[in-house]
């Protein structure tokens, strides 16, 4: 069975990911991790670096404020961006592997991630039907 994403119809409710708004591109680079308001730096004054005078001030801060200040360091942001890049690459590799298993016309047709998932659902349903008959 060859699947064609143009004529495929499913009874699935529409989701915000169907809008193809570019969220799949957002995870590849350095950016805010969503944990604190305002993104990197957040417009807040940074605390003193370890070893600088004023280190004792950090002991009086709430746990959440200490976390925000730790996440504001360049070292933390760089490490987070690296982890996120690795995660996104693994995610994209998994989609590429799934895409290779789906028969489509033409075989090299470029599909979005949502199209890959929907075609996989249809193909698995078709294979189940073939096994049941």
Curated annotation (Swiss-Prot):
Q: Where is the composition biased (Basic and acidic residues)?
A: 52-65
Q: Taking every annotated instance into account, which residue ranges of this chain make up the domain bHLH?
A: 75-127
Location in or out of the cell: Nucleus
Asked if the record carries the keyword Protein transport, the reply is no
One Gene Ontology CC term in the entry: chromatin
Q: List the disulfide bonds.
A: none
- Supply one GO molecular-function term: sequence-specific double-stranded DNA binding
Q: Which UniProt keywords apply?
A: Developmental protein, Differentiation, DNA-binding, Nucleus, Transcription, Transcription regulation
PROSITE patterns hit by this protein: BHLH
- Keyword Disulfide bond attached: no
Q: Where is the composition biased (Gly residues)?
A: 25-45
Q: Where is the composition biased (Basic residues)?
A: 66-79
Pfam families, from UniProt?
HLH
Q: Which CDD domains match?
A: bHLH_TS_HEN1 (cd19701)
Could you tell me the Gene Ontology terms of the biological process aspect for this record? cell differentiation; central nervous system development; positive regulation of transcription by RNA polymerase II; regulation of transcription by RNA polymerase II
Q: Which PANTHER family match?
A: HELIX-LOOP-HELIX PROTEIN 1 (PTHR13864:SF20), T-CELL ACUTE LYMPHOCYTIC LEUKEMIA/STEM CELL LEUKEMIA-RELATED (PTHR13864)
Subunit organization: Efficient DNA binding requires dimerization with another bHLH protein.
Protein's recorded name: Helix-loop-helix protein 1
């Amino acid at each position: 069975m060859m699947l064609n994403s143009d004529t495929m119809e499913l009874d699935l409710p529409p989701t915000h990911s169907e809008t193809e708004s570019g969220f799949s591109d957002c995870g590849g680079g350095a950016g805010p991790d969503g944990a604190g308001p305002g993104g990197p730096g957040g417009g807040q004054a940074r605390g003193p670096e370890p070893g600088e005078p004023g280190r004792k001030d950090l002991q009086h801060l709430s746990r959440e404020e200490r976390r925000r200040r730790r996440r504001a360091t360049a070292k933390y942001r760089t490490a987070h961006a690296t982890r996120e890049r690795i995660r996104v690459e693994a995610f994209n590799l998994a989609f590429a592997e799934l895409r290779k298993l789906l028969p489509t016309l033409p075989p090299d047709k470029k599909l979005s991630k949502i199209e890959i998932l929907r075609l996989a659902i249809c193909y698995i349903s078709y294979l189940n039907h073939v096994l049941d008959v």
